[in-house]
């Protein structure tokens, strides 16, 4: 059946900002869908609020809107663009919920728009817990005993029926948001409160516990002719009770019998048919009782998902691309398999002859107050995937790819009590405790009893632990070719072997090279070698035949960023993708190395050759040994590849672009200070301390308050502002573990300074200023957590001119060749240099979208030898409109965590708003970030004494827009003295009713709360913010943010939507750019 010709224009809804439960896998799927539909001649309109995505590049879709993903904004776009259809299955839960809201509010009917890929009824049937349960009963599939509830009374009645422990699952949420497992009445009440709030339909499923059952997933694709295929089966290493996004998962399923697999396969197809998913991909989750084999259906997602991105990367089958084409009428047998060069149709089920393991990455170090126990609400921020011929090999490769300081199991001496507790109550490191248990002499039965992990997996880990313990007793000289090869086949890294045998990693590598023992590379081909693979999608293993077949072309290798984490996320992958595309266009063969299954960089057609490998020195050197690239780029993947720069250079690798020595000159405090002194540039007063005693002494010289941090970190890891010697001593005790024997840096903290970010490109002869961004939050808030505006909204032209001059001077002095980011602080018109990073920064995608200048692409060509002049890229573009980037935080996933901002980065993603004024752009950025900004109601003000003079104007603006004001007594008296009418409200410690009572009673619409450094003020402010977070009340904790929102509220419901291509055209005309 050919594609549909009755529709011409299709709108795709993206997933919005990166949040826990919905990450960059939707950029991967959305980008595939856009390309697939344009390939078929459809006009594609894309809506997404996330500027760090490849899918929002102006040359991806025909028309691109970087706008808030809410139905009111979508209606404005639909009215303007008049699409024939909407594809809502590529943007996760956000897109599905938005599509349903468009339908519910009559927008689809009003403009005659149809949903393709999944009908409204199919979405509702899959997402509505009650309807889904009824559908499963109808087709004879069991589900856990459960009840749909819309009130606390119903919830308690249901709980009595199912007993404890009780699972609570809200409807229409992602990543298990709002859900959890309750073991007692207090926990049940708390989780239900959270769940009702999280569910847009105020609906919960109260479900019997199936904790300890084995969990499986099936990735299914179906077309309109009822052809169905299973792309991949996935088994969760962790049993039921841990969200699948937080579980280690393995593909294909390892412990199913063939009979069980066929039953599950047939059930999956029956689920899709009953729900009504007739074009596209879905994910169906099952649980099996290990005691008797009983199988139940847990849930299904009628869209591409996190698991489908994993299945696509695991098999090479492009689920999103195929699903997009099925949505416009094709059938599976009409589409061809790209990996095999079109030799076979996509109706052939993929077959894999290797094992894929995904391990999640967590960020609890950023949220010390958070509960780190894993439940049905997802908490991981990223993941790593590895392939090997066995589970053992792929697991060990995945563990070293996590970049958490381990290169294998790294056994620890934990107490038996700790081990039992960690096995029974899973946390982020449970797999390491499994190994610790075997190392401590626990039996297989004991470990299974406490963890409920399938014995087959435990046997594999027990064997690896026994290998480690035996290796510790061996002499290095005893390791011959056969023994070393046997260990490598089980996934042991050179570094881990070296640690166990007490030699250096380079000793092991030298011995391996002397024995001519190298990995071979196998191709991911979807067909287990039955047909020739046309694409070079490769993984390493220790076997005989190598399928890499390297070419003799001039090659550039790009090292990716590894797993997402706070401080290093999709922005760096964006840069890697642009480097690959630009260099390929310039005639180079591009080689991508990465291990993150969520990303566009690990799509098999982004680069010429893809190596899905951990980003360790050993793994990278082996690929270089095989491929012999002309140059390697380490500047685009964040701190991960940068840490390898010196070692790669020492091994004779040609690092193109800025040299490792220049990177070190920017990071090394003494060297960098000398450069600034020579240039006559200012830095905040600072010193470097190597121990606690020295820090205390030097702090007196610098003067409090201080910004303290370890050297060589990304994302402000362990960065803090300290106000006195006691706080400094506390910091020194806690921060030593993250300092890597590097010194602690002490900088004088510049109060009330404006922070400024600059991205630029230097080619040794000229400097292109990419953009000057003014932060909304003052210096002292991590740049990744602050909102910022391009162009600057209050800096004078003189200050901006001087910033440009200083940026250029530093780029030349450091010998930068490629991208560079500088952070300045401006205090009373005086400019201070905070730090310089001669690499890609997390603001590069935002600057590129805001200006239309593709910085990552231009810089990649500079690194390969093409000057800025040759690219006609020497003119800074200053747009005639404002773009605001706003950070998005995961606080809702971590009840109890304080939401105040600090020098340590805690945001997971970002959004962008555009407007003719800063206020309009800021308002749209707040909407995009999910803030529910009220148009009326009462604003609560509690302001630190030093901030009170500036709050008067904020209060006046808010009052002029019709808001009521209430404040604590000190703030209220100050405002009244300055002519602002305000109601007085009690602080928490001043009696009842107080501000927290008012918050809980829904009497407060917005909160502006700045805090002094007194312990009682900090504690009270935390309670205010914690309660506000529960009820989604917008809260602003800095004066600058308060000023911005007081201006932004004028634009409530009065904003325009702007196509990115039109914005860039207006920018080019304003700047007379002809390129």
Curated annotation (Swiss-Prot):
Region of interest: Allosteric domain: 931-1075
EC assignment: 6.3.4.16, 6.3.5.5
Binding-site residues, Mn(2+) 3: 823, 835
A single BP term in Gene Ontology: L-arginine biosynthetic process
Binding site for Mg(2+) 4: 835, 837
Oligomerization domain: annotated segments: 404-548
Residues annotated as binding Mn(2+) 1: 285, 299
Pathway annotation from the record: Amino-acid biosynthesis; L-arginine biosynthesis; carbamoyl phosphate from bicarbonate: step 1/1; Pyrimidine metabolism; UMP biosynthesis via de novo pathway; (S)-dihydroorotate from bicarbonate: step 1/3
Gene Ontology molecular function: ATP binding; carbamoyl-phosphate synthase (ammonia) activity; carbamoyl-phosphate synthase (glutamine-hydrolyzing) activity; metal ion binding
Binding residues for Mg(2+) 3: 823, 835
Catalytic activity reported: hydrogencarbonate + L-glutamine + 2 ATP + H2O = carbamoyl phosphate + L-glutamate + 2 ADP + phosphate + 2 H(+)
Binding site for Mg(2+) 1: 285, 299
Region (Carbamoyl phosphate synthetic domain): 549-930
Pfam families, per the entry: CPSase_L_D2, CPSase_L_D3, MGS
Sites where the protein binds ATP 1: 129, 169, 175-176, 208, 210, 215, 241-243, 285, 299
Amino-acid positions noted as binding ATP 2 in the UniProt annotation, renumbered to this chain: 709, 748, 750, 755, 780-783, 823, 835
Coiled-coil ranges from the UniProt annotation: none
Enzyme class: ligase
Description of its domains: The large subunit is composed of 2 ATP-grasp domains that are involved in binding the 2 ATP molecules needed for carbamoyl phosphate synthesis. The N-terminal ATP-grasp domain (referred to as the carboxyphosphate synthetic component) catalyzes the ATP-dependent phosphorylation of hydrogencarbonate to carboxyphosphate and the subsequent nucleophilic attack by ammonia to form a carbamate intermediate.
Assembly and interaction partners: Composed of two chains; the small (or glutamine) chain promotes the hydrolysis of glutamine to ammonia, which is used by the large (or ammonia) chain to synthesize carbamoyl phosphate. Tetramer of heterodimers (alpha,beta)4.
Function, as annotated: Large subunit of the glutamine-dependent carbamoyl phosphate synthetase (CPSase). CPSase catalyzes the formation of carbamoyl phosphate from the ammonia moiety of glutamine, carbonate, and phosphate donated by ATP, constituting the first step of 2 biosynthetic pathways, one leading to arginine and/or urea and the other to pyrimidine nucleotides.
Homology family: Belongs to the CarB family.
Protein's name in the database: Carbamoyl phosphate synthase large chain
């Amino acid at each position: 059946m050919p594609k549909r010709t009755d529709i011409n224009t299709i709108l795709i809804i993206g997933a919005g900002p990166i949040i826990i439960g919905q990450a960059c896998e939707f950029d991967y799927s959305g980008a595939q869908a856009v390309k697939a539909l344009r390939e078929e001649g459809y006009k594609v309109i894309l809506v997404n609020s996330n500027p760090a995505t490849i899918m929002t590049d102006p040359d991806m879709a025909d028309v691109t809107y970087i706008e808030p993903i809410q139905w009111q904004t979508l209606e404005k776009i639909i009215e303007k663009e008049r699409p024939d259809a909407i594809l809502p299955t590529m943007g996760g839960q956000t897109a599905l919920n938005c599509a349903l809201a468009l339908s519910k509010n009559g927008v689809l009917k009003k403009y005659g728009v149809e949903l393709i890929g999944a009908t409204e009824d199919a979405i509702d049937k899959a997402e509505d817990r009650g309807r889904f349960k009824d559908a499963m009963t109808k087709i004879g599939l069991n589900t856990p005993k459960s009840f749909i509830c819309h009130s606390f009374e119903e919830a308690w009645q249901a709980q009595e029926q199912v007993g404890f422990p009780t699972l609570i699952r809200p409807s229409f949420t992602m990543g298990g948001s709002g859900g959890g497992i309750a073991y007692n009445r207090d926990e049940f009440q708390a989780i239900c409160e959270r769940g009702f709030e999280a569910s847009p339909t105020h609906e919960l499923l109260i479900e019997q516990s199936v904790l300890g059952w084995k969990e499986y997933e099936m990735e299914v694709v179906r077309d309109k002719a009822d052809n169905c295929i299973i792309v991949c089966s996935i088994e969760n290493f962790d049993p039921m009770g841990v969200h699948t996004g937080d579980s280690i998962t393995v593909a294909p399923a390892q412990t199913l019998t063939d009979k069980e697999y066929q039953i599950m396969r047939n059930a999956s197809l029956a689920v899709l048919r009953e729900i009504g998913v007739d074009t596209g991909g879905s994910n169906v989750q099952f649980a099996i009782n290990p005691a008797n084999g009983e199988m139940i259906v847990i849930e299904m997602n009628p869209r591409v998902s996190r698991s489908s991105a994993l299945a696509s990367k695991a098999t090479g089958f492009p689920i999103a691309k195929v699903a997009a084409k099925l949505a416009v009428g094709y059938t599976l047998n009409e589409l061809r398999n790209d990996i095999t060069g079109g030799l076979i149709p996509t109706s052939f089920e993929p077959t894999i002859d290797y094992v894929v393991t995904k391990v999640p990455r967590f960020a609890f170090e950023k949220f010390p107050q958070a509960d780190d126990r894993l439940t049905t609400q997802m908490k991981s921020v990223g993941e790593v995937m590895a392939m090997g011929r066995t589970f053992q090999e792929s697991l060990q490769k995945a563990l070293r790819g996590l970049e958490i300081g381990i290169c294998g199991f790294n056994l620890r001496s934990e107490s038996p009590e700790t081990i039992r507790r960690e096995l029974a109550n899973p946390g982020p490191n449970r797999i390491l405790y499994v190994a610790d248990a075997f190392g401590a002499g626990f039996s297989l039965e004991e470990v299974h009893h406490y963890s409920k992990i399938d014995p087959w997996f435990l046997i594999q880990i027990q064997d690896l632990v026994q290998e480690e313990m035996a290796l510790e007793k061996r002499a290095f000289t005893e390791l011959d070719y056969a023994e070393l090869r046997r260990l490598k086949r089980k996934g042991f890294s050179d570094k881990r072997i070296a640690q166990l045998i007490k030699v250096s990693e380079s000793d092991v590598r030298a011995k391996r090279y002397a024995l001519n023992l190298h990995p071979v590379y196998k191709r991911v081909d979807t067909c287990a070698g039955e047909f020739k693979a046309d694409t070079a999608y490769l993984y390493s293993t220790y076997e005989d035949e190598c399928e890499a077949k390297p070419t003799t072309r001039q090659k550039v290798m790009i090292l990716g960023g590894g797993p997402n984490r706070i401080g290093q996320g999709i922005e760096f992958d964006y840069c890697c993708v642009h480097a690959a595309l630009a260099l390929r266009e310039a005639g180079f063969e591009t080689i991508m190395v990465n291990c993150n299954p969520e990303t566009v960089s690990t799509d098999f057609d982004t680069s010429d050759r893809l190596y899905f490998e951990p980003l360790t020195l050993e793994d990278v050197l082996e690929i270089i040994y095989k491929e012999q690239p002309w140059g390697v780029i380490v500047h685009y993947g964040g701190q991960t590849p940068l840490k390898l720069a010196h070692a790669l250079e020492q091994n004779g690798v040609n690092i193109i672009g800025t040299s490792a020595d220049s990177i070190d000159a920017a990071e090394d405090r003494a060297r960098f200070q000398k450069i600034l002194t020579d240039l006559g540039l200012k830095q905040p007063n600072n010193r470097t301390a190597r121990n606690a005693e020295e820090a205390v002494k030097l702090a007196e010289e610098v003067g409090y308050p201080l910004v303290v941090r370890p050297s060589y970190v990304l994302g402000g890891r362990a960065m803090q502002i300290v106000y006195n010697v006691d706080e400094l001593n506390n910091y020194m005790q806690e921060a030593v573990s993250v300092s890597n024997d590097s010194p602690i840096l002490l900088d004088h903290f510049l109060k009330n300074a404006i922070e400024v970010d600059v991205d630029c490109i230097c080619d040794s002869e000229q400097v292109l200023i990419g953009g000057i961004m003014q932060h909304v939050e003052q210096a002292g808030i991590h740049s990744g957590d602050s909102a910022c505006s391009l162009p600057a909204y209050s800096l004078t032209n003189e200050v901006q001119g001087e910033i440009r001059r200083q940026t250029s001077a530093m780029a030349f002095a450091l010998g930068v060749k490629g991208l560079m980011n500088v952070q300045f602080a401006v205090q009373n018109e005086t400019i201070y240099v905070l730090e310089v990073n001669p690499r890609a920064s997390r603001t590069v995608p935002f600057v590129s979208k805001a200006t239309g200048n593709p910085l990552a692409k231009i810089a990649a060509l500079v690194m390969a030898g093409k000057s800025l002049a040759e690219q006609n890229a020497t003119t800074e573009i200053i747009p005639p409109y404002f773009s605001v980037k706003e950070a998005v935080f995961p606080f809702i996933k971590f009840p109890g965590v304080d939401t105040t901002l600090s020098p340590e980065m805690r945001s997971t993603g970002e959004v962008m708003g555009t407007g003719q004024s800063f206020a309009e752009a800021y308002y749209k950025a707040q909407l995009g970030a999910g803030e529910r900004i009220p148009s009326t109601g009462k604003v609560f003000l509690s302001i630190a004494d030093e901030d009170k003079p500036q709050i008067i104007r904020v209060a006046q603006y808010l009052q002029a827009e019709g808001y009521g004001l209430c404040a604590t007594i000190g703030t209220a008296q100050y405002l009244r003295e300055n002519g602002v009418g305000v109601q007085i409200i009690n602080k928490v410690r001043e009696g009842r009713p107080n501000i927290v009572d008012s918050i809980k009673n829904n009497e407060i619409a917005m909160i502006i709360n700045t805090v002094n450094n007194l312990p009682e003020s900090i504690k009270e402010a935390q309670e205010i913010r914690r309660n506000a977070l529960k009820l989604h009340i917008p809260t602003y904790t800095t004066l600058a943010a308060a000023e911005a929102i007081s201006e932004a509220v004028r634009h409530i419901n009065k904003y325009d939507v702007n196509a990115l291509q039109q914005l860039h055209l207006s920018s080019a005309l304003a700047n007379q750019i002809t390129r």
